[in-house]
Amino acid sequence: MVDVNRFKSMQITLASPTKVRSWSYGEVKKPETINYRTLKPEREGLFDEVIFGPTKDWECACGKYKRIRYKGIVCDRCGVEVTRAKVRRERMGHIELKAPVSHIWYFKGIPSRMGLTLDMSPRALEEVIYFAAYVVIDPKETPLERKSLLTEREYREKLQEYGQGSFVAKMGAEAIQDLLKQVDLEAEIAELKEELKTATGQKRFKAVRRLDVLDAFYKSGNKPEWMVLNILPVLPPDLRPMVQLDGGRFAASDLNDLYRRVINRNNRLARLLELGAPGIIVQNEKRMLQEAVDALIDNGRRGRPITGPGSRPLKSLSHMLKGKQGRFRQNLLGKRVDFSGRSVIAVGPTLKMYQCGVPRLMAIELFKPFVMREIVAREYAGNVKAAKRMVERGDERIWDILEDVIKEHPVLLNRAPTLHRLGIQAFEPVLIDGKALRLHPLVCEAYNADFDGDQMAIHVPLSEEAQAEARLLLLAAEHILNPKDGKPVVTPSQDMVLGNYYLTMEDEGREGEGMIFKDIDEAVMAYHNGYVHLHSRVGIAVDSMPDKPWKENQLHKILVTTVGKILFNSIIPSEIPYLQETTNENLTDSTPDKYFLEPGQDIQTVIDSLEINAPFKKKHLGNIIAEIFKRLRTTETSAFLDRLKDLGYYYSTLAGLTVGIADIPVIDNKQEIIDAAHHRVEEINKAFRRGLMTEDDRYVAVTTTWREAKDALEKRLIETQDPKNPIVMMMDSGARGNISNFSQLAGMRGLMAAPNGRIMELPILSNFREGLSVLEMFFSTHGARKGMTDTALKTADSGYLTRRLVDVAQDVIIREDDCGTDRGLVIRAITDGKEVTETLEERLFGRYTKKSVKHPETGEVIVGPDTLITEDMAAAIVNAGVEEVTIRSVFTCKTRHGVCRHCYGINLATGDAVEVGEAVGTIAAQSIGEPGTQLTMRTFHTGGVASNTDITQGLPRIQEIFEARNPKGEAVITEVKGTVIEIEEDAATRTKKVFVQGKTGMGEYVVPFTARMKVEVGDEVHRGEALTEGSIQPKRLLEVRDTLSVETYLLAEVQKVYRSQGVEIGDKHVEVMVRQMLRKVRVMDPGDTDLLPGTLMDISDFTDANKDIVISGGVPATSRPVLLGITKASLETNSFLSAASFQETTRVLTDAAIRGKKDHLIGLKENVIIGKIIPAGTGMARYRNIEPLAVNEVEVIENIAVDEAIVESSED
């Protein structure tokens, strides 16, 4: 068996007849499977033990040789080799076909490879192969043309006319095989290359396609005649099994039926040929054999599929590979694993960040081998069998052992759907009673889990290395930041937020106000004894908190704060200032001076002069977490998060917030606002009836009126709300609900959308507290139903988008430290009209500069070249008034099959520079795909208002961008740089004409009459700039501008969609995906290279092909860049394994086999498929080739290091 981790590449070619014979262990001559009485395989049948190996380990068929000691002996009675039964999964047989048969993939695929090789139409091929016509193979002296078709009648007439044997014409695959043998590849290729020099149009296109196929055969060493089969391989029997069901019936794989048909027809054909049957009968039998082999290889590709019982089409070999249930996606890319379990999850509020609760019953089953080993080691049992019995009986002693075994042994928890890498994290197991897994509440957000019946899977990493990786790389406490935007993903929610909000509230005149305490303990004791309220403002000696970073002038003073804030600050690391207010200055700099008593000042006077501070809300807690992470990194942050969680839960319980109907306020002037709106609507309708406005204008005015009425109610609600109202507290703290929910409870529900997406003019005037009328209830159900269907459709769409994104970028890995590129990317803030979509500061953070950044006024260098920009540097650059910066970018990186560290920058998930080996392509795909479900589905229906086209937004727009489709509502772009000199309206054709005067000439552009113009007369325009509103077609932009312009445009467009929905994604993720779409070029003129015109190839391969030619002084090839959609780009990848496992499996494999393609196993998927360790992370060659040192070597090195240090210090 080949060691899978040793081989470098994998090649696929056409199998020659000799190759098939060399695979085979014997010919299958009979269609029988197994004997119905003995249930033993029949001799020379499809399950024969002589050919395929024994059905039982180390046992021949007749039972003469049993046991392993006869290994390798071939039984003299039954002829079966004594070996392992699993050889029945790898040993193949063969069938000697009595007539050649064409392979349907090469004849029926698009384009037909046989047709292109022979320069015959697929229709003509079909007629010949299925015995409807003769083809002339050798016209000899006759005027017939080679490869011309003759019907039965014409054939007889020509024979009479020219005499027997005067020419050769045949039918069936045999004829095609003869023609294929006659093809002289070298001569044909030379002829086609000549033809290409002059050919144009359709003729050129056809010649390029033919040349491509012939060249593939020539270079790969495959012979064209191998597309016709003379010998058919038979799949090993355990890959097409027959299993006995209860009740004595058998379930067999469909392949057995398909093979049986082939064998039956082949045997019948042999008999007919022996008997010398009439030609027409033999022909019919050959045709049936051809159809049987077609069905076996790809049932249903031609004609009606062969069906089994209940008219179900049989699954052929091709179907075994295709689709989600096929071999690639079902068994090779992901497998079911042992040492795993799944259960319902419940909340574990007492757990630490790195722990999870595992039920005892699950743990004993999952860790069974470890427990058994320990039982034997402790000599509770003599052998493994006895130990197993102990575990299964549930002996008391096993629980102590289990406790010891799971110590320090992390487990992985996974929740489906795993949308991003935080969907699998490692935890240390804690044994619990019950049957549900316990999950830490803070990791719920990363998993998108809740406790309404969600289930999770648990996996045990077995090897030492796997455990080490789980502990160091996957531990939940390490995953504080989200890889998509570098923001904390473990922010407290709901009860935790509410508890901390309640704790940090301030109130006037509560008991104990103005008391002064000497230290924290005294303050807390006073609170517990009821002398002071949690929200009362009191004083505390600054000196009692010596660890905090006080300013010089604040020492030895009294700080005015509340008991709640004292408790809140007691859990915050001492490096962070004392948090007295929610401002950024307090968090990053120091506690403001106004909260400190000057000597001799009265505390009550100071308290009265201070405003009431807002409590800490969800977003403030998020800022605190981010700041702590920035300063103290992972370990301290996760410890703090646990303290925050415990505090939040405790005070949430103490606060005891409840909600009743009385807590929903009543707005005093609601009726007035609604009456005023009714009056306004009546006026609008009157104006419309008088003909003063159009229907569209009236509709807009009415809906706007109702929107304004709803907003007025909302505003009134906010003005009159009581900050201690439980609903207000929940909403304000960010624990649950938002202003829109609140206004539907207490204000009015407002306008609803009709089923067609158009907003209905009749609003719902009631709110939920008053209750809805029947009609209002009916109106509001449209939206609810549409919401449900949208969500369901969106989930599937978003999942498929993620899959395509992963596929196109899975081989993008950080390959080297620095690619040494001399290009950079100039970036500025991304704007949409006047609005800023993404600020320059956000775009700069975590990138390397290309050139140094200078102050625009003073000229001093703010950041040097090739420096990693930190948050502070980014802020300094923007504050200096710099508007554009040249940075290192993925777009300009020269690394092959990946990116270098400097062009990528920071790893957003860790906050440090990215490591070599990071699989940034997969991370990028997940970061873009995971928020896909949050995007809207809708194309906006404005009811024919405002714009001439519906604007595509949300998920459909993202798909449009990544698939490089022509956008809806396309903008007209200019091809010349110059000035707009005239915009002419033509009422007759309902168009406008825009004239742009450039240096080289005049550009004239026809624009639809209804399109909204972006330019006016006198405006300066650049090539590729949009003249009208709408989306630019990227392929068109590529023709007018360069690759970088297209890349920058696509990046900005993706960001616009996500940011408009409030989703933040790092630029670099989009850059990785967009770069993959522009990796290919199309060869225009091959020059002196041996490239073929019209070929799609990787930029790096193209450059390599040109390099040698340029050095030797030849004419280099020319090419033009091509923008491919992600699906197309995935299928065009150099790895055929990756492409075949993605989509269009048969087409990819057909093409790869003809070309004799080699897969160099560069990406992740191809390595997973063959079971090799993936070349990313710790699987990279540079990390795998490290030799561990022996202990004594380590000591030697340490001693040397110590000696060197001593020498250095003495030199100092």
Swiss-Prot record:
<keyword id="KW-0240">DNA-directed RNA polymerase</keyword>
<feature type="binding site">
    <location>
        <position position="819"/>
    </location>
    <ligand>
        <name>Zn(2+) 2</name>
    </ligand>
</feature>
<dbReference type="InterPro" id="IPR012754">
    <property type="entry name" value="DNA-dir_RpoC_beta_prime_bact"/>
</dbReference>
<dbReference type="InterPro" id="IPR007081">
    <property type="entry name" value="RNA_pol_Rpb1_5"/>
</dbReference>
<dbReference type="GO" id="GO:0003677">
    <property type="term" value="F:DNA binding"/>
</dbReference>
<comment type="similarity">
    <text>Belongs to the RNA polymerase beta' chain family.</text>
</comment>
<feature type="binding site">
    <location>
        <position position="900"/>
    </location>
    <ligand>
        <name>Zn(2+) 2</name>
    </ligand>
</feature>
<dbReference type="InterPro" id="IPR000722">
    <property type="entry name" value="RNA_pol_asu"/>
</dbReference>
<feature type="binding site">
    <location>
        <position position="454"/>
    </location>
    <ligand>
        <name>Mg(2+)</name>
    </ligand>
</feature>
<comment type="function">
    <text>DNA-dependent RNA polymerase catalyzes the transcription of DNA into RNA using the four ribonucleoside triphosphates as substrates.</text>
</comment>
<dbReference type="Pfam" id="PF00623">
    <property type="entry name" value="RNA_pol_Rpb1_2"/>
</dbReference>
<keyword id="KW-0460">Magnesium</keyword>
<dbReference type="InterPro" id="IPR042102">
    <property type="entry name" value="RNA_pol_Rpb1_3_sf"/>
</dbReference>
<feature type="binding site">
    <location>
        <position position="78"/>
    </location>
    <ligand>
        <name>Zn(2+) 1</name>
    </ligand>
</feature>
<feature type="binding site">
    <location>
        <position position="452"/>
    </location>
    <ligand>
        <name>Mg(2+)</name>
    </ligand>
</feature>
<dbReference type="GO" id="GO:0000428">
    <property type="term" value="C:DNA-directed RNA polymerase complex"/>
</dbReference>
<keyword id="KW-0804">Transcription</keyword>
<dbReference type="InterPro" id="IPR007080">
    <property type="entry name" value="RNA_pol_Rpb1_1"/>
</dbReference>
<keyword id="KW-0479">Metal-binding</keyword>
<dbReference type="InterPro" id="IPR045867">
    <property type="entry name" value="DNA-dir_RpoC_beta_prime"/>
</dbReference>
<feature type="binding site">
    <location>
        <position position="903"/>
    </location>
    <ligand>
        <name>Zn(2+) 2</name>
    </ligand>
</feature>
<dbReference type="InterPro" id="IPR044893">
    <property type="entry name" value="RNA_pol_Rpb1_clamp_domain"/>
</dbReference>
<dbReference type="GO" id="GO:0003899">
    <property type="term" value="F:DNA-directed RNA polymerase activity"/>
</dbReference>
<feature type="binding site">
    <location>
        <position position="60"/>
    </location>
    <ligand>
        <name>Zn(2+) 1</name>
    </ligand>
</feature>
<dbReference type="Pfam" id="PF04997">
    <property type="entry name" value="RNA_pol_Rpb1_1"/>
</dbReference>
<dbReference type="Pfam" id="PF05000">
    <property type="entry name" value="RNA_pol_Rpb1_4"/>
</dbReference>
<dbReference type="InterPro" id="IPR007083">
    <property type="entry name" value="RNA_pol_Rpb1_4"/>
</dbReference>
<dbReference type="InterPro" id="IPR006592">
    <property type="entry name" value="RNA_pol_N"/>
</dbReference>
<dbReference type="GO" id="GO:0008270">
    <property type="term" value="F:zinc ion binding"/>
</dbReference>
<keyword id="KW-0548">Nucleotidyltransferase</keyword>
<feature type="binding site">
    <location>
        <position position="75"/>
    </location>
    <ligand>
        <name>Zn(2+) 1</name>
    </ligand>
</feature>
<feature type="binding site">
    <location>
        <position position="450"/>
    </location>
    <ligand>
        <name>Mg(2+)</name>
    </ligand>
</feature>
<protein>
    <recommendedName>
        <fullName>DNA-directed RNA polymerase subunit beta'</fullName>
        <ecNumber>2.7.7.6</ecNumber>
    </recommendedName>
</protein>
<dbReference type="InterPro" id="IPR038120">
    <property type="entry name" value="Rpb1_funnel_sf"/>
</dbReference>
<dbReference type="GO" id="GO:0006351">
    <property type="term" value="P:DNA-templated transcription"/>
</dbReference>
<dbReference type="InterPro" id="IPR007066">
    <property type="entry name" value="RNA_pol_Rpb1_3"/>
</dbReference>
<dbReference type="GO" id="GO:0000287">
    <property type="term" value="F:magnesium ion binding"/>
</dbReference>
<keyword id="KW-0808">Transferase</keyword>
<dbReference type="Pfam" id="PF04998">
    <property type="entry name" value="RNA_pol_Rpb1_5"/>
</dbReference>
<dbReference type="Pfam" id="PF04983">
    <property type="entry name" value="RNA_pol_Rpb1_3"/>
</dbReference>
<feature type="binding site">
    <location>
        <position position="62"/>
    </location>
    <ligand>
        <name>Zn(2+) 1</name>
    </ligand>
</feature>
<feature type="binding site">
    <location>
        <position position="893"/>
    </location>
    <ligand>
        <name>Zn(2+) 2</name>
    </ligand>
</feature>
